[in-house]
Amino acid sequence: MFGLFGLWRTFDSVVFYLTLIVGLGGPVGNGLVLWNLGFRIKKGPFSIYLLHLAAADFLFLSCRVGFSVAQAALGAQDTLYFVLTFLWFAVGLWLLAAFSVERCLSDLFPACYQGCRPRHASAVLCALVWTPTLPAVPLPANACGLLRNSACPLVCPRYHVASVTWFLVLARVAWTAGVVLFVWVTCCSTRPRPRLYGIVLGALLLLFFCGLPSVFYWSLQPLLNFLLPVFSPLATLLACVNSSSKPLIYSGLGRQPGKREPLRSVLRRALGEGAELGARGQSLPMGLL
């Protein structure tokens, strides 16, 4: 019995410090992406999504690191920590779904997309993503007693079911758009495979393997804490990997082998020349994106 308890304590400590290490590196990478996309690269329709996605990941990782330090110092974890960190994770999920769907539509219907898409559609959609997500997480958390000591038995199930259903639908929409894009680019499209296509698929693979455990934990938190307590620290670690790895994907796809370049050039190449053309109001050459 004591051996199992000691083994669990060791495992929990190892995962905790791994999460802290990953979380410390993630804000640096996402901060560099934020700086370059926000101030050094002309904003195009897809770079705006990546800018907001980097902001959501930066906030998630910063909160995660701050709360981990507080947990280590105080020796206890408040449910408020999970609610606030999951809030920024949820914003990232919304943004990734919108980004994947728009990237898919731009490849399936390029002529219609270029002619009918409003110039500031990406900025408007990102603003619409942030606005409803901010209450979408705290409301069910408050009703179910995660933000206070008492729960509302009549209201909690309805809020929780609606929240869980919505997040699972978003994950499915993002993944479906990615699968359609993969099949189209691989089997049907005659144009060269774009780098931005790799960003979409890389982000969706991260979501599937590293992000969905957090959605499941949000959905089944009391049950998982009782039946599988190991799930919570692992889901937290994987969520940090999900948010920290996206800058590495951008860098890997945009960097030329054997050359040392500033991050601005790497990001511009990963996004494609169409990002700059779109920012000047010209038509988007979708084959370049």
Curated annotation (Swiss-Prot):
One of its GO terms (molecular function) is G protein-coupled receptor activity. The keyword Nucleotide-binding does not apply. One of its GO terms (cellular component) is plasma membrane. InterPro entries: GPCR_Rhodpsn (IPR000276), GPCR_Rhodpsn_7TM (IPR017452), MRGPCRFAMILY (IPR026234), MRGPCRG (IPR027336). Residues 1-13, 64-78, 142-163, 217-221 are extracellular. GO terms for biological process: G protein-coupled receptor signaling pathway. The keyword Zinc does not apply. The chain crosses the membrane at residues 14-34, 43-63, 79-99, 121-141, 164-184, 196-216, 222-242. Keywords: Cell membrane, G-protein coupled receptor, Membrane, Receptor, Transducer, Transmembrane, Transmembrane helix. SUPFAM superfamilies: Family A G protein-coupled receptor-like. Belongs to the G-protein coupled receptor 1 family. Mas subfamily. This is Mas-related G-protein coupled receptor member G. It comes from Homo sapiens (Human). The gene is MRGPRG.
